[in-house]
Amino acid sequence: MTTVRTRIAPSPTGDPHVGTAYIALFNYCFAKQHGGEFILRIEDTDQLRSTRESEQQIFDALRWLGIEWNEGPDVGGSHGPYRQSERGEIYAKYAKELVDAGHAFYCFCTAEELEQMRAEQMARGETPRYDGRALLLSDEEVQRRLAAGEPHVIRMKVPSEGICVVPDMLRGDVEIPWDRMDMQVLMKNDGLPTYFLANVVDDHLMGITHVLRGEEWLPSAPKLIKLYEYFGWEQPKLCYMPLLRNPDKSKLSKRKNPTSVTFYERMGFMPEAMLNYLGRMGWSMPDEREKFSLAEMVEHFDLSRISLGGPIFDIEKLSWLNGQWLRELPVEEFAARVQKWAFNSDYMMKIAPHVQGRVETFSQVAPLGGFFFEGALKLDAKLFESKKLSADQVRQVMQLILWKLESLRQWEKDRITGCIQAVVESLELKLRDAMPLMFAAITGQASSVSVLDAMEILGPDLTRYRLRQAIDLLGGVSKKENKEWEKLLASIA
């Protein structure tokens, strides 16, 4: 009997996302319920954005939740390497096989040519897609341009008509017209694969039998199915999971909800409760109970109990569930967990240098630096009153800073300062006009330790969460303002 093997393949390009944890949990439970294996693979072919720091955060976040893997970059295994950046020769080999078999082709089109092509198609009211012009090149012309070292990509061929039937374990057969599919790039001009080629090759070579992934990948499933057909490989069973959503039913995003697992760890949520809550996202126990452990979820896991309606990720409900778990802890364990969460040596050593020089007694530490150990702050709107700025300008400055910080990939003091500086300069203000607002939002006080140091220590999610909290306290942002301010944001360097 074939061993069930599932996997999660996150990209290490930022903080570990709760959506990644959600998909990892369901893949883990499916594998373990069938006595199988769960694999962790790192999709790090985006060389500009991928970092080993983000990779380690993924490891730490999943382990904090209690999700362990049988094979992966840090534990090894017989199907490695488990980082896509280390599998370049493998992808090149299989891409060449597709070209030699006539299923893929070399494309030498420049970015300018592609942009012009799409502009002309849109002007004609057509859906932008590659028009196949490279297929008209003769073999001699292709070889000449390859020999000359001309930049190129490898694209797959796709049918121009007909229907692709996607067998989904949740929805049954889903029909998708081939004319919606573009001639997908498989190998980029830097020699690295795109998601589609790497995904198919890795899943096959690693013996993945079942793929549970987010439903946002369903529209592009025909490309993956066609690649399996081209290679002559059996495709894994496919299951497209419903996406997590904000309370307003929009797709879960960091603009409306904290999305990093590390945020919830820092906020003092229990990993058991977090995992329990993610397990309830579109799935339920046979007896409908709300509180259950990972072991209980594995024991009773059944895909047929997954609802296709977009599950709502609601922090208030998560907090309620966390309270159920927390209050059932023995007092000794409760005390130990509080100490580990708030007063662990690593976190204290980050804070101590910024507090020590500002206090005369230990009793002054809590009033000065207590905000380091809180989640949502009790804010006073009076703290945001400014002699220089109107109430609308206060909200505008804070919202633009929040948006600017959302684009920050490396969370460092100098870069945080640069974001704030860019916003105030674009508004023809001074840094001193914005900093009191930042003190108020981040620390809940008019003055404290360096707010820039505090933001670096608190991290991106908690910092952005507090800025959103302050903006909401001051009345939020209207649709009209949102539209106008986003245009302004686009002009900020």
UniProtKB/Swiss-Prot annotation:
| Motif 'KMSKS' region, residue range(s) on this chain | 251-255
Q: What is its EC number?
A: 6.1.1.17
Keywords (alphabetical) are: Aminoacyl-tRNA synthetase, ATP-binding, Cytoplasm, Ligase, Nucleotide-binding, Protein biosynthesis
Q: Which family does it belong to?
A: Belongs to the class-I aminoacyl-tRNA synthetase family. Glutamate--tRNA ligase type 1 subfamily.
Question: Briefly, what is this protein's role?
Answer: Catalyzes the attachment of glutamate to tRNA(Glu) in a two-step reaction: glutamate is first activated by ATP to form Glu-AMP and then transferred to the acceptor end of tRNA(Glu).
Check the record and name the HAMAP family matching this protein: Glu_tRNA_synth_type1
Name the record gives this protein: Glutamate--tRNA ligase
Question: What is the species of this protein?
Answer: Pseudomonas entomophila (strain L48)
Name of the coding gene:
gltX
